Amino acid sequence: MRSFITALPFLALLVDARKCGNEVVPPSVQMAARYFDRQDKLADARTLQAVAERSLVIDTYFHVISSDNTLKGGNLPDEQVTAQFNALNRDFKDTGISFVLKDVTRTVNKEWATFSVDNDSKDVEYTMKKALRQGSYAALNVYYRPLGDGLLGICVFPEDVTQGDRTFVLDGCQVLTGSVPGGDTTNYNDGKTATHEIGHWLGLFHTFQGGCAGGDGVDDTPAQRSPTNGCPTTNPDTCTGPQYPGVDPIHNFMDYSYDICMYEFSLGQTKRVFDFWDRYRAPHIGGPEPTVTRSSTTTTTTTTTTTTTPVITTTPVITTTSTTTKSTTTKATTTKTTTTKSPTPTPSPSIPDWWCDLFGICRSA
């Protein structure tokens, strides 16, 4: 539903239900969403048809962070990594978005695997992501680890960044290891958590955000009073009255239903994704990639880097290319490897008309 509120902390309050934890939506993102909302009102059928026919391929990096080399400790076998990757492409297929798995890293680091997602742990999160993150701001980095606090995942929204700054480093999604296909999280183990979180990474809000008086800022998702728990046999209608047409979108990936219940994004959500992509992430395509530093500070650290053959429509081939193990019984060990890619210069983009309308910063006459 089209509507906005001023603060959007994506933290579920339900017990024994899907829990997604997110940062408050930055004011600049809310402002951009309002602008996109105004533009949507002017969109005609041809504009929406153009959105439906558009396509996008996103470079993707998976990082598996575990306490030890066991499945219980958070280490995922290649088969489940492949299944999760294929689930993402299946879930986003109707939006025209596909993912290319560029690299899979595996890191054994108990502190990184178990830290809580809160403001007090930002330094640990920053250290982990600075060591593992790859690609430009247009590249998706997903960190699979045994999240605590009952959370299934957490992801950040797109916003203005400078290559390599703190906001750039903290970009990406953290997803509960047990939520991958075949994982041990009952009702949430078909890979849909990653789909939901990546929806946030692409600019989408929860369908129930703000209740009946709030909304996700997308016109074709009906108003919803509260998140869905489970998978109802019929769609409830929690926001009644002529001003709230439609029933709750319980099958939408941005609700909180069981994985088995989720299977769609709306056309309006697809348009919003491309709006945010063009505004925030597309300008970074082809730009210089940051220096990638691999480091760890636990008493026993194993880092395995694997590469994948980019495959979109078929099962990706995962091939291990290097394994590095450092251990000691007397003191912490720090391992660092630095890889620098030659920057590719890109011309500075011109200031678009919508930027002038939105922020009042315009071209010189």
What kind of feature is each model-predicted range?
Residues 1-19, 364-365:
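Fungal secretory targeting signals
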Residues 16-138, 145-148, 290-308, 313-314, ...:
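Propeptide-to-catalytic entry region of secreted or membrane-anchored zinc metalloproteases
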Residues 82-230:
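Metzincin-family zinc-dependent endopeptidase catalytic domain
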Residues 163, 221-297, 360:
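Metalloprotease/metallohydrolase-associated module, dominated by Zn2+-dependent proteases
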Residues 289-365:
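Fungal extracellular serine/threonine-rich, low-complexity, intrinsically disordered "mucin-like" regions
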